[in-house]
Swiss-Prot record:
This is Histidine ammonia-lyase. It is found in: Cytoplasm. CDD domains: PAL-HAL. GO terms for molecular function: histidine ammonia-lyase activity.
């Protein structure tokens, strides 16, 4: 059970919400602020004075006054008309994060929503009744309206859900959670819809996957150093201290730890080779830059996870209703775009190491890592697959945040595209996962070919894990299943666990 303290969520909590089947409860310390916000909205609605989002239309229709007897209909219509998403359902882990983030934002007491509505969201979450939310349809301002409308429609008994993973109607989902359809009061529909929770949830969910891939890439890169008979001297701490970038310093330390005591390395200390290619030698510099970007993105997304991104905002102490633009997800878009650059570079560097290993001139290994080359093609086309994926990532890494299209009759004339920026991270991560799987297979093959010498004590379990699933490549065979089984292990963090390094979300 995780106690949500609005405004004080942590990265480990968020990773746990996404990756584990934990349940949620709301910190009772937040109740007074929530109730005060709801009372403030009720008082404003009762007076009848125009207040945006409470008794007016929305967007370009903000100047249209809504009579008091139509306020409930206004909120219902808002939810139903905005539930216009398309595409595949959002991943379960992302929906869980979305709901938790929405509860945190509402729980800070500046949205004017009743606890009854929040309690319903918690009951759905804890019963594993998750709204079916189409993943496409948000431009990231005014908030993630369409995705959050699909979440909110379930509270009205409209739409679809997944009940413990099985697709069902919203009404069935409410029954399983012990709920009846709600009637939303003034501003409650808008409070549920307005916010950056969809884009932030997608970005966080994919960031956790990319963090795992980063750790896997450290392991794969270190194994490739041994496979290519590369030097460990470029990882000397003194080199990296002189430059000063913390990510680079930390990455170099990881490579030193992983490669310490390698018999392969000891076997070629007196060789004539002066310098390794950049894909081996510059790993700390490249991976360090990725790490710095990822850490910055995590900081930004944690702030956003704890933010109130509603509009308008209620200030119960003064009775004021202030309209602003906290729904604009530009910080999330930038963070997601930075993560895309990092994840793409992780894959690009791994692809270059695969190319090095299969090149006999550079690696000193048999061409394409197989004996009897010619009749056997070995890793030739596995590298082509890695190259295809790396190239695809370069296109996917184009920043989404540089694009904007005006909406709502030019009232909403600049938008963030944060949801797309966050959503495409999943494709980049999947591509990078498969590139790393191919590298792990190639590096393991190279290490085998260095016999009688072995890799380091820290990397020996990696070899055992790989060889426990995939045999040494002796002769050409149907290769795709080998890649698939190692990619599955990558996704399960089997190799990430070996890296002597952890992110803030894992602590």
């Amino acid at each position: 059970m995780i106690t949500l303290t609005p405004g004080h969520l942590t990265l480990p909590q968020l990773r746990q919400i996404a990756r584990e089947s934990v349940q949620l409860t709301l910190d009772p310390a937040s109740f007074a602020k929530i109730d005060a916000g709801a009372k403030a909205v009720a008082d404003i609605a009762a007076k009848g004075e125009p207040a945006y989002g409470i008794n007016t239309g929305f967007g370009r229709l903000a100047s249209t006054h809504i009579p008091h007897d139509q306020l409930e209909l206004l909120q219902k219509n808002l939810v139903l008309s905005h539930a216009v998403g398309v595409g595949e359902p959002m991943a379960r882990s992302s929906v869980r994060l979305l709901m938790a983030l929405k509860l945190s934002s509402l729980g800070r007491g500046h949205s004017g929503i009743r606890r009854e509505v929040m309690d319903a969201l918690i009951k759905l979450f804890n019963a594993d009744v998750l709204p079916l939310i189409p993943v496409k349809g948000s431009v990231g301002a005014s908030g993630d309206l369409a995705p959050l409308a699909h979440m909110s429609a379930v509270l009205l008994g409209v739409g679809e859900v997944f009940i413990r993973g099985e697709r069902a109607s919203a009404l069935d989902g409410l029954r399983v959670a012990g709920l009846a359809p709600l009637t939303l009061q003034a501003k409650e529909g808008l409070a549920l819809l307005n916010g950056t929770q969809a884009s932030t949830a997608l970005a966080l969910d994919n960031m956790f996957s990319i963090e795992d891939l980063y750790r896997t890439a450290l392991v794969a890169g270190a194994l490739s150093v041994d496979a290519a008979a590369g030097s460990v001297k470029p990882f000397d701490a003194r080199i990296h201290e002189l430059r000063g970038h913390q990510g680079q310093i930390d990455a170099a330390a990881s490579y030193r730890d992983l490669l310490a005591g390698s018999p392969i390395n000891q076997s070629h200390l007196d060789c004539d080779k002066v310098q390794d290619p950049y894909s081996l030698r510059c790993q700390p510099q490249v991976m360090g830059a990725c790490l710095d970007q990822m850490r910055h993105a995590a900081d930004v997304l944690l702030v956003e996870a704890n933010a109130v991104s509603d509009n308008p905002l209620i200030f119960p102490d003064t009775g004021e209703v202030l309209s602003g633009g906290n729904f604009h997800a530009e910080p999330v878009a930038f963070a997601a775009d930075n993560l895309a650059l990092a994840a793409s570079e992780i894959g690009a560097l791994a692809e270059r190491r695969i190319a090095l290993l299969i090149d006999a001139t550079l690696s000193g290994l048999p061409p394409f890592l197989v004996r009897d080359g010619g009749v056997n093609s070995g890793f030739m086309i596995a590298h082509v697959t890695a190259a295809a994926l790396a190239s695809e990532n370069k296109t996917l890494a184009h920043p989404a945040s540089v694009d904007s299209l005006p909406t709502s009759a030019n009232q909403e004339d600049h938008v963030s595209m944060a949801t797309f920026a966050a959503r495409k991270l999943a494709d980049i991560a999947d591509n990078t996962k498969h590139i790393l799987a191919i590298e792990l297979l190639a590096a393991a093959q190279g290490v085998d070919l260095r016999a009688p010498y072995h890799t380091s004590p820290k990397l020996a379990p990696v070899m055992e894990t790989i060889r426990g699933k995939v045999a040494h490549y002796e002769l050409d065979h149907y290769f795709a299943p080998d890649i698939a089984v190692i990619a599955k292990l990558v996704g399960e963090r089997a190799f990430a666990k070996v890296a002597p390094f952890s992110f803030a979300s894992e602590q």
